C-alpha cells in the first residue's frame, strides 16, 4: 500500500499554486520494491555482446544483474504535476521516467502505472522496470534507466510547470535533458527533448521514448490510417498492415492492431511510410486511450511492442509486476524510425524537439490528432457515420464540420475541453464516397485544431494492398564481396554508425586501404578510430594521408574534416602551432567552422589570451548558437576579463537552453562567490555514486581543457569536502594528485587513493591516458595506478597495453583480486587459457566470495578442455559462493549433467528461482537435459514408468526457471521421437551394438505411454 507524504518545503509550497491550475509538488511515496543485489565488483568489458541489435557495453558502468525475491517498502521522491484534468508523477530515482499518469476526469491511467517496483533483467546493465515513459538515449533501454538522474523544476509565466530530468551518459559522453511540462486547463503532457554532443568527436545516437500502456482483449494499437505496412527490427521483414501474419512468414493473417490476436509470441512492429504525425492506442472496454503527437520529420518512429496474449506473455507479466496486468509499449523515435537506427551527432551539436501526449475518451477510436485535439470518423452501417472529437485544451464556441465535397453534412458550434468531448452520429448519403468526406475542428477564431479525410486503399491489408511489400535491407555482406572502395567505406560507416556488435568496421576500412591506401574518406574514418583509442601517431598518419589526397595540387579542400581532426590530434599531443594551422584550415568550410573555432578558442584560453579567445568562441557560436560547451567557455572567458554582467547574461542563455547544464553552475558559483561552494546545495537533485563522480570529472576535464587547472582543483577540493561519494573515490583523488603542482603532495594524494577501494572506479576518457601516464611516472610501483590505467586502455581499445598494465598491477600487488581477475580475463580473451586460469585461481584465493570468478573461470576451463569432473570439484570447492549467482550456478548444473550427477542438478533447479535475461533460455535446456539423461538411465534399467515420468517432466516449463513455454507444447512422444532419431543417427555413424536393445526399450516406453493415455 502506498502512502503519500508531501515534503515540507517552502519551495514547493510556493510552486503549488492552485490558482494557476498547475500544481507541482514533491511527495515521498512508499512503494513495495524487489531489491536488486549489489553491483558487480569486477569491471565487465565488451566481448561482442549484442544488446537491442547493437553493442551491449557494460563498462564504464557496473553490472546490476542480481535480482532477488526480497520485497521491502522503499521511499521514493516523486515529482507530481497536475491540474484539474490530469496528474502525472516523475520518478528521478529510476531513470527520470514518467511513473504515473492519470486522467482525473475518468480515472484512466493513460500510461501504465505500477503499484510496485519489480525489476527484471532487460536493461543494458541488467535491472529494468516496466511501465510509464522511459527516455532511451543514446541507446535503447539505456544504461542508466534504473538509476537516479539529475533533475530540477521550472515555473513559467503562463502558469505551466516543468520538471527537467537528464544526465551525462558515460559510454559516448553525450548529454541529454527532457523537460516534462503540464499546462493550465489542458490535458497535454509535453516533453522538450535535448540531445547534446559536448565532445570534440562525431557520435552516433538513437532516441526512443519507451511508452507503456495498460492493455487487454479490448485494446487496439492505432497507427495512422495512411500506414499500409509494418516492419520488424532492422527492416529485415515487412508485413501488410493492419492485416498480416501474427508470426513472421506465416500464411495465417489476423488484424495485427489488436493485442488479443498475438496468441503465439511477443512481437515488435514499426509503422512504415506514414505522413501523419500521431500514433496512439485505444481501450474500447474503457472507451479511453492515449495519443502521441510530434513533428513527423523530427520524430518519425512509431512502434509497438507486446509480450502478447499467450503463455510467454503471461509469464512476463508475472516477472515484471505482481498485480498490474498486461502492458504494451507504444514507442516513439526521434531522428529514428527503427531499432537499431542510429544517426550522427556532430561535435558541439544539440538536437531539440518536442513531443506531446494526452488522454482521449468517449470517441471510440482515433483517426488523426494534433497537440490540440483528436478526431474519430467511423463508418457504422446503413449510411451512419460516427464523428467524435476530444480536445486537449479548453475551447468555447468551437466549430465542427463534416462535408462531402462541397456539401456540408454537419456544421455545429460546440464547447469542448478535456472533460467534455463531442460525439454524434451523422447520416451520409449512399452516393458519397468515403474519400470525399472531410471533417475539421476549428476554434472560435477559425484556427484549425485538427482535421481528417478518410484514407482509401483498395483491398487494404490481407496481403492485397495492390502494392508490393517494401524491400528488406540487403544487410552487410562479407568484406570480400564488395567490389569497390566506396562500397567498403559505406559498409564500414554503417557498421560504425549502428554500433554493430557482430562486425568490426575496421575490417572494411582495412580492405579498402589495401585497394587504395590514400582514399580520403576511409583514412579520415580510420584516423577517428585511432583518436578514440588515443593512438595519436596512427591517427596522425591516416589523417595526413587523407589531407594529402584532398589537397592535391594545392587544392582548398571541399571537406575539411581531416584538418579538424588533425588539429585536435595536435592539440592533444601539445603541438600547438600545428594544431592552430589545421584548425584554422578547418574553418574554411561550414561543416567544421563551429567545432574548429571552438577548439581555437580553447587553445587561446589556455594561453590566457582571453580577448582573442572571446572573439574565437563568438565565431564558433555563429554556426553553433546552442553549443553549451562553447557558451560556458564564453562565460568563463568573460569572467576572466572581469565582465561579470555579460557572463551572467550568458549563464541565463545557457539555462534557457538546458536548465540541467552542470558546468555553467560551477562558473556561476565562481561568478557570484569566487568559489565552488554551490556544489553541496545541488547534491539532493543530482545523480549519485559513480555517476555523480563521473559527471563531476567531466567538469574537471572541461576546466583542464581551457588551462584552468586551479579551477579544476577547486572543484575537486569542494567535492572532497562534501564527503562521499567523492572523498572515497580513487579517481577523484588521482585527478587531484595530477593537478597538484608539488610532486611530494601528489605522492601523498596517490597514497590516500591507494588506501581506498578500486571497485567502481572506471576511467573512461581519452584525456585520462596522459594523466595516468604521468601518475605512473610519479609512482611507477603503484599497483592501483597500473590497475586503473589498464582498465582505461583496455576499454578504449588498446587491449594489449591494458593487459600489460594489469600484469604490472598484479605483480606489484599479488593480493589484488581485481587485478588478478583482469589479467585472467585478458589472457582468456587472447586464448592463453593456462595463464588465464593461473590468474583466476589467484583471484579466487584473494577473494573467494566473488561468484563471477567461478563463472568466468569455468568458461575458461571448458575452452581449455579441462575434464568435467575436475571442473565439478573446482566449482564445488566454492559452492557457497557459486550459489550466490545464477550464472555460476548454471555453470555448475551443466557440469553436473556431464558428470552424471543429474540428480544434484535437478534438486537445485527444483528449489531455486532463476532470474534470466530477456531472451535467455539456457537454464531450461539444462533442465530438459537433466531429466532426459535421468530418464535414459532409468530406461536402461527397464524402469519404464519412472523413465516416462522423467520424460514428462522434460516437457514442462517450470515458472521458477523464468523461461516461457512455446506456443506449441512439447509432448512425451516428441521426446521419444527425438531419442529415436538420436539412436538412428548414432547407429548410422558408429554402428552402436546396443541400438537394438535401446530401440526395444523405446518401443516399450511408447507402448506404456499409449496405455496410460487410453486409460
Question: Across the structure, where does each feature detected by a protein language model lie?
Answer:
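Extended, loop-rich substrate-binding clefts of extracytoplasmic carbohydrate-active enzymes
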Residues: 44-73, 78-80, 129-187, 312-343, ...
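Start-of-helix register in tetratricopeptide repeats
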Residues: 486-487, 521, 561, 595, ...
Amino acid at each position: 500500500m502506498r502512502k503519500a507524504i508531501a515534503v515540507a518545503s517552502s519551495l514547493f509550497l510556493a510552486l503549488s499554486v492552485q490558482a494557476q491550475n498547475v500544481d507541482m509538488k514533491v511527495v515521498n511515496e512508499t512503494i513495495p520494491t524487489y531489491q536488486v543485489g549489489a553491483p558487480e565488483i569486477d569491471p565487465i568489458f565488451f566481448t561482442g555482446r549484442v544488446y537491442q541489435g547493437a553493442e551491449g557495453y557494460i563498462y564504464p558502468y557496473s553490472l546490476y544483474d542480481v535480482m532477488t525475491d526480497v520485497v521491502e517498502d522503499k521511499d521514493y521522491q516523486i515529482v507530481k504535476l497536475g491540474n484539474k484534468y490530469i496528474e502525472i508523477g516523475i520518478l528521478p530515482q529510476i531513470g527520470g521516467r514518467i511513473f504515473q499518469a492519470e486522467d482525473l476526469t475518468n480515472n484512466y491511467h493513460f500510461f501504465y502505472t505500477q503499484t510496485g517496483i519489480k525489476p527484471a533483467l532487460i536493461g543494458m546493465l541488467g535491472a529494468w522496470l516496466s511501465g510509464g515513459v522511459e527516455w532511451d538515449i543514446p541507446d535503447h533501454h539505456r544504461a542508466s534507466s534504473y538509476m537516479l538522474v539529475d533533475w530540477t523544476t521550472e515555473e513559467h509565466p503562463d502558469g505551466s510547470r516543468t520538471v527537467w530530468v537528464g544526465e551525462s551518459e558515460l559510454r559516448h559522453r553525450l548529454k541529454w535533458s527532457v523537460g516534462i511540462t503540464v499546462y493550465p486547463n489542458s490535458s497535454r503532457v509535453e516533453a522538450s527533448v535535448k540531445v547534446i554532443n559536448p565532445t570534440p568527436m562525431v557520435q552516433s545516437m538513437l532516441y526512443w521514448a519507451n511508452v507503456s500502456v495498460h492493455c487487454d482483449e479490448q485494446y487496439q494499437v492505432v497507427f495512422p490510417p495512411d500506414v499500409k505496412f509494418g516492419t520488424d527490427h532492422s527492416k529485415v521483414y515487412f508485413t501488410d498492415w493492419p492485416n498480416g501474419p501474427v508470426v513472421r512468414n506465416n500464411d495465417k493473417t489476423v488484424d495485427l492492431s489488436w493485442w488479443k490476436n498475438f496468441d503465439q509470441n511477443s512481437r515488435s512492429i514499426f509503422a512504415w511510410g506514414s505522413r501523419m504525425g500521431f500514433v496512439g492506442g485505444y481501450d474500447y472496454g474503457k472507451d479511453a486511450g492515449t495519443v502521441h503527437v510530434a513533428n513527423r520529420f523530427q520524430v518519425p518512429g512509431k512502434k509497438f511492442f507486446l509480450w502478447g496474449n499467450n503463455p510467454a506473455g503471461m509469464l512476463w507479466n508475472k516477472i515484471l509486476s505482481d498485480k498490474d496486468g498486461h502492458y504494451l509499449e507504444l514507442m516513439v523515435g526521434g531522428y529514428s524510425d527503427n531499432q537499431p537506427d542510429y544517426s550522427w551527432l556532430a561535435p558541439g551539436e544539440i538536437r531539440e524537439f518536442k513531443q506531446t501526449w494526452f488522454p482521449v475518451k468517449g470517441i471510440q477510436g482515433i483517426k488523426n490528432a494534433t497537440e490540440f485535439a483528436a478526431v474519430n470518423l467511423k463508418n457504422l452501417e446503413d449510411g451512419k457515420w460516427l464523428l467524435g472529437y476530444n480536445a486537449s485544451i479548453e475551447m468555447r464556441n468551437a466549430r465542427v464540420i463534416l462535408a462531402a465535397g462541397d456539401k456540408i453534412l454537419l456544421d455545429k458550434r460546440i464547447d469542448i475541453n478535456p472533460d467534455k468531448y463531442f460525439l454524434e452520429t451523422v447520416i451520409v448519403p449512399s452516393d458519397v464516397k468515403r474519400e470525399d468526406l472531410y471533417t475539421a475542428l476549428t476554434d472560435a477564431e477559425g484556427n484549425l485544431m485538427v482535421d481528417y479525410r478518410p484514407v482509401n486503399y483498395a483491398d487494404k491489408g490481407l496481403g492485397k494492398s495492390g502494392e508490393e511489400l517494401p524491400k528488406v535491407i540487403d544487410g552487410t555482406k562479407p568484406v570480400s564481396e564488395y567490389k569497390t572502395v566506396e562500397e567498403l567505406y559505406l559498409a564500414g560507416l554503417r557498421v560504425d554508425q549502428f554500433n554493430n556488435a557482430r562486425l568490426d568496421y575496421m575490417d572494411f576500412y582495412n580492405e579498402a586501404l589495401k585497394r587504395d591506401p590514400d582514399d580520403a574518406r576511409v583514412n579520415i574514418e580510420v584516423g577517428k578510430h585511432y583518436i578514440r583509442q588515443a593512438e595519436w601517431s596512427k591517427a596522425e598518419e591516416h589523417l595526413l594521408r587523407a589531407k594529402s589526397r584532398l589537397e592535391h595540387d594545392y587544392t582548398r579542400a571541399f571537406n575539411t574534416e581531416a584538418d579538424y581532426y588533425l588539429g585536435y590530434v595536435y592539440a592533444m599531443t601539445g603541438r600547438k602551432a600545428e594544431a592552430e594551422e589545421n584548425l584554422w584550415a578547418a574553418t574554411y568550410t561550414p561543416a567544421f567552422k563551429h567545432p574548429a573555432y571552438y577548439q581555437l578558442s580553447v587553445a587561446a584560453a589556455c594561453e590566457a589570451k582571453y580577448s582573442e579567445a572571446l572573439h574565437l568562441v563568438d565565431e564558433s557560436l555563429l554556426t553553433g548558437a546552442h553549443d553549451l560547451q562553447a557558451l560556458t567557455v564564453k562565460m568563463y572567458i568573460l569572467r576572466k576579463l572581469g565582465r561579470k554582467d555579460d557572463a551572467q547574461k550568458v549563464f541565463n542563455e545557457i539555462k534557457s537552453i538546458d536548465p540541467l547544464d552542470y558546468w555553467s553552475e560551477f562558473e556561476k558559483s565562481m561568478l557570484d562567490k569566487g568559489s565552488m561552494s554551490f556544489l553541496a546545495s545541488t547534491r539532493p537533485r543530482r545523480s549519485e555514486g559513480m555517476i555523480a563522480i563521473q559527471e563531476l570529472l567531466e567538469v574537471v576535464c572541461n576546466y583542464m581543457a581551457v588551462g584552468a587547472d586551479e579551477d579544476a582543483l577547486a572543484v575537486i577540493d569542494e567535492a572532497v569536502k562534501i564527503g562521499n561519494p567523492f572523498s572515497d573515490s580513487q579517481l577523484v583523488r588521482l585527478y587531484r594528485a595530477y593537478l597538484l603542482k608539488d610532486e611530494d603532495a601528489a605522492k601523498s594524494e596517490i597514497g590516500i587513493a591507494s588506501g581506498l577501494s578500486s571497485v567502481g572506479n572506471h576511467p573512461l576518457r581519452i584525456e585520462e591516458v596522459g594523466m595516468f601516464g604521468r601518475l605512473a611516472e610519479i609512482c611507477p610501483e603503484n599497483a592501483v595506478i597500473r590497475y586503473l590505467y589498464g582498465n582505461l586502455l583496455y576499454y578504449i581499445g588498446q587491449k594489449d597495453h591494458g593487459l600489460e598494465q594489469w600484469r604490472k598491477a598484479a605483480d606489484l600487488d599479488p593480493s589484488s583480486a581485481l587485478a588478478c581477475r583482469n589479467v585472467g580475463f585478458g589472457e582468456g580473451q587472447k586464448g592463453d587459457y593456462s595463464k588465464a586460469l593461473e590468474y583466476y585461481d589467484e583471484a579466487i584465493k584473494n577473494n573467494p566470495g566473488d561468484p563471477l570468478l567461478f563463472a568466468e573461470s569455468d568458461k575458461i576451463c571448458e575452452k581449455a578442455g579441462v575434464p568435467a569432473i575436475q571442473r565439478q570439484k573446482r566449482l564445488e570447492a566454492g559452492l557457497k559462493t557459486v550459489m550466490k549467482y545464477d550464472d555460476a550456478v548454471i555453470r555448475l548444473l551443466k557440469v553436473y549433467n556431464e558428470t552424471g550427477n543429474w540428480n544434484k542438478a535437478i534438486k537445485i533447479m527444483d528449489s531455486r528461482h532463476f532470474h534470466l535475461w530477456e531472451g535467455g533460455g539456457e537454464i531450461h535446456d539444462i533442465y530438459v537435459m537433466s531429466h532426459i539423461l535421468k530418464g535414459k538411465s532409468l530406461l536402461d534399467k527397464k524402469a519404464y514408468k519412472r523413465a516416462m515420468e522423467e520424460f514428462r517432466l522434460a516437457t514442462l516449463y517450470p515458472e521458477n526457471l523464468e523461461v516461457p513455454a512455446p506456443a506449441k507444447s512439447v509432448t512425451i512422444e516428441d521426446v521419444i521421437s527425438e531419442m529415436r532419431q538420436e539412436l538412428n543417427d548414432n547407429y548410422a555413424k558408429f554402428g552402436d551394438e546396443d541400438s537394438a536393445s535401446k530401440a526395444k526399450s523405446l518401443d516399450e516406453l511408447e507402448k506404456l505411454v499409449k496405455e496410460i493415455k487410453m486409460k
